[in-house]
Amino acid sequence: MDLNFSATSVSRARWSSAYASDPTVWEQLFETKWSVVSNILERKLSDPEHKVVYDELMSLLENMTNMCTLLMLEANSQPEPIIGPILDKFFTEQILERVLDWSIQLTDSLKSICQLAIIRIFEMIVSDSHSQNHCLLVHKPILNPLFRLCEWFQRADIYWRVSKSENKKTSEAEKMFVLLLNQICTKLVEDRTLLHFFFHSNQFVVFTELIPFLYSAGDTGQLARDAVLLILSVSAEDKSIAEYVTERTSFCQVLTTGLSACFSQLPRIILGDGGERLVEDEYRDFLADYHSALLFCNAIAQTAHSEVVGNIASFFYTGFLTNVIKPAFLQNDREYIGASMVYLQMCLETIVEPVLVRSIVQMILTERDDNGTLFYEIVISYVKGGDKTSVTSLSLIDSFLKLACEDVMLALVFRPLLTNHSATKKQLSVVYKASRGGELSQTYLNCIPICMLEYREAASHALLSSYMYSTRIRMDARSEQCRSWKWKYDGVVAGSFVLPAESDDDATFNVSFSRMSSSRSSTSMTPYVSNRYSNGSHLSHVFNINKVCPLGQPQEQNADLSLSELDDDLEEDKDFILPSIDMEDVSEEMTASKVMTQSTIDYMHISGLDGSESDDALPIRIEDSERSETDSEAPKSNFVLSGWRDVKDMGTFKQLLSKQEVKGEKLDSSEIVDFINQKYDSLKLGEEKKEDIEEEESENETKGKEIKSRIVTDGFSIYNFPERSKLLQTILEGVETLCENELPFNTELFSLIADLATYPQPLLAYYLFDPKEDSSEKHLLTILQGVQTRIDVMAEGIESFEIWIERGFETLKARACRIKQQSTASSPRTSDDHDPTLFYGRSTMAPPGRKPLLREPSRQETLDDQTARRTALAAILLAHLCQMLASIVLQQSLII
């Protein structure tokens, strides 16, 4: 059934340029149309039992559409916002109100048709309004019927969903209604004054009606989300609208509930090897919906009012992360766990707004399972196994590291290192030596398998240069990300409680003077100030202040300083430090007057004592007094310094004043009164401003406490951590079994190492790269040397090993091409198209797409062939890894 009526269908024969520019003809035609509509309305009004037939309905709708077309012609032709004859007719006759009253009385079979037509009429009024200064929606005869239509549509929509629950597709009326609301929101952006007409303290119909359609399929849901985003961006500074959204609507709950619903529709199994993530065609739209929902949440957090954002973050944490994501990681199905890791990684890579990222970090660091295991420890535990889930867990951990969040890195890496590593300050200082970079990088280059040295694709100066170029860019970016961290994690600045000292002479010569200058003010105060990690317990009760070098001085000068003396210093710092005065001897009165300089100047101005009008004015003479407490002259003083304590009557006061010789005229009493009043008003205004500022700070503090009350914190002390880093231990174990691992696992593992090694913290750099004296503990360098020896020995025993190397190059190239093709649609690469590095710039999550044909190893592959294939791939990867680590070590000499 075609309901696209047009005004030209009636008057096409008379349409001309003269007709289009003649308002008189418009009025005549409008009266003709209105007479038809009026008769139909009166017929039902005079006879309530009259049953409207289909032809009668079509006649009314066609004429109403033509009338609205003429109305828009009149409104757009006027240069000023005036009420023309046609618009006046709409007002006086209340045309839209009467049509709505008539429509409600129709039978159910005709009511839906009429409702759709009325929606299109209002859509015409909104979309065809091209006048910049006259929007018809500001008039109540137009606006009130629109509100009634929204309420009527809501009731009818509920009826349709109940009576036709089997039809899950969006109806045509729903699509047109959402389109109408979207166009209204667009008008609100163009003219923000319209917000006053649509929002009241107890209702915001346009916003409320959009909520049920936020997650509708297709264009309808997208239009609804765009409209909501427009409203929240326009009202971002309006606190009343923010309170309405959070307190009187279910928007925040629906937002996170819809995200959870999108997650529940995702497939429980991800195809591919873990590095290549693929889905079946039937789940392609569901994955796209999940991605759109994440983008929408992030966009809302970027544009909405802070109160709305805080509410969304709360529901995002409780309704989605802890109730949906966390249980998915605690299942017994490793396939589903691996898929859930991919979806969480997709969430991490899509959401960039800090308030939502903070919620994700909170879940990672604080949530536990029934056994008390932390969430990130659960993820690390899934690395073992070497299957597809292990690959996805490595990729997810890599996403954790990419956040460059100090809290995440403290929990995963630095907290165990601070309490369990055995390096002393003297040993750790090796990372600052200039010769370290060249010597250590050569050591890592020596770990390249001998069998790979003849292949320029895997070991060459050009490839090393490419790694050095990429490493410089990545480490500079990482250093910038870590610039705002609270600690440097260098094992020196934090004090002697972090690193055991071999002797009292352990040098701290690598700490810059500026840091040593600030160590007194920052470190000495820590016993009295709480710390966000250890709740004030990061310094033990036996903390030795002697280890702190004050202002760059040697430790011996401060060896006798005790905590009691430190308390005295702290008490002294609380006092006001008097400014230096260029006088040999200054009385107590002068000292007090110097502290209150401004008050003295004001008094001198009143008494005329600063009335000198020339630069050569003689200084005020200071005469001795009988009870003077000092006989010293003060050449730079311009006031009597003694005798004021003895002033007990007006005579003595005048006698002291008479001793002053003043050049210049004294002020009149009226001028003095004006000056005093001016000073009083200034002080009073300052107090009022101070009270306003204190009141505002109190409100902000109250809000801050409310927000903090929503956040579950789990602070910990660095002392209570007996275990070594599970992440670092897992990484070293993975490198040690390089020849037994499959290609996807090794590539994800080395990509994780690449991101971890780019952190510029000296403590981590020493642990990862430098050789250790303790041979009982495994270290990366010794492990690489062992793997190199093993690969070279195995290569000598494999027949035609060079053929397997060539096949390995082909396998890596084909895999890189597949991953690139999958990721080109969402993030096409530009400068890295010909990047020969293997572990930099890879896409971790391909966009939704069809399942391509995968080339998998033949099931008839013999055990010897499998060993040869893995050994060849391990040799290629190890050659790349050694060159990457060597380039990182060289760059560390410039960064650390």
Curated annotation (Swiss-Prot):
Residues 853-865 have a biased composition (Basic and acidic residues). The lineage of its organism: Eukaryota, Metazoa, Ecdysozoa, Nematoda, Chromadorea. Pfam families: DUF5917, RAI16-like. InterPro entries: FHIP (IPR019384), FHIP_C (IPR045669). Belongs to the FHIP family. This is FHIP family protein C05D11.8. Residues 823-865 are annotated as: Disordered.
